[in-house]
Amino acid sequence: MYKRQANEDGDLLTKTRLTQIGRDLLESILGINQITIAAVHGASAGGGACIPTACDFRIGTENCIIGYPEVKLSMNLSWGALPLCYNLVGPAITKRMVIGGELEQAEDLFAWGFLDETVPADKLESRSTELAEFYASRPALAAQMIKRGVNALQMANAGIMHMDGDQNALATLSEEFQEARDAFLNRKK
């Protein structure tokens, strides 16, 4: 309720601080010393798609769908997720996913490099565990150093994304956002 109220009536400071919570979450995931693996079953959208984007590996079921539908609410992708998506799939697919705002199919996500693997739904937990055990069996210090190095390379340009929270807060003031939000909240359930 607090977040919805802030989006309706809150000032820019409140809105940017709320967006910072998501950025802090993704930075925390990136900063975990151990290897992180997202196991995606069903739909993963918006913030739910940003979380696996920040993980080291992503395994999805053959019928999972993932997307960033923020644009449909006249909002940009925030939380610092844009460079993470860009580094996974490149500029053209990032634009397709973020500007298009559609939920993408597992087959395409795998072909683009967003998903590392797809498995039948009944194999998701066992395959995720198998992969976790594999990486956990590697020398911890070396794995941690490699992960930190790769993340540093991956995020070399992320500093320019400081403004995504401000852009997001500003976008929520637009008439397009108000109309899209009202349509979303009033849709038939």
Enumerate the language-model features and the residues they cover.
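Glycine- (often His-adjacent) and acidic-residue-rich active-site loop
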Residues: M1-E27, S44, S74
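Well-ordered beta-strand positions
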Residues: F57, R96, G100-E102, D108, ...
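CoA-thioester-processing core
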Residues: D24-G31, A39, A45-V98, W112, ...
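Helix-loop "lid/cap" segments that line or gate small-molecule binding pockets
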Residues: M97, L109, G149, L153, ...
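A general structural signal for well-ordered alpha-helical segments in protein cores
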Residues: G22, L82, P91-T94, A142-I146, ...
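C-terminal long alpha-helix characteristic of the crotonase
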Residues: I59-C64, L115-H162
